């Protein structure tokens, strides 16, 4: 950790952080107390779970606890990058809105503590769908 502090102090890096796919809640809580990492990358979606696309491993979390932890992180100036944003499946906020991944992404980024999101897209049509959602915010 001293290495990263030194690199940041000397201007070599502006920020440092970490990402984790599982068993990360305690890491985020500890970081909220110690304020060492500037940025965290965390699985976050409407379902509170995901299946890893390569390993097939299932992961879930206590959504209320995670939102509380991320709310605290955001209030302390820690950058929160959401990943696995579409891995909870299609989402619709109401019966009159067609379920889809763009709506799932909207659900994620409407949380004020989310600084940015890693969004998986496989083609230009999906890029256009996501841009449309982002432009409507």
Question: Which role fits each region the language model picked out?
Answer:
Residues 1-137:
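Beta/alpha (TIM)-barrel catalytic core signal, keyed to glycine-rich beta->alpha loops juxtaposed to Asp/Glu
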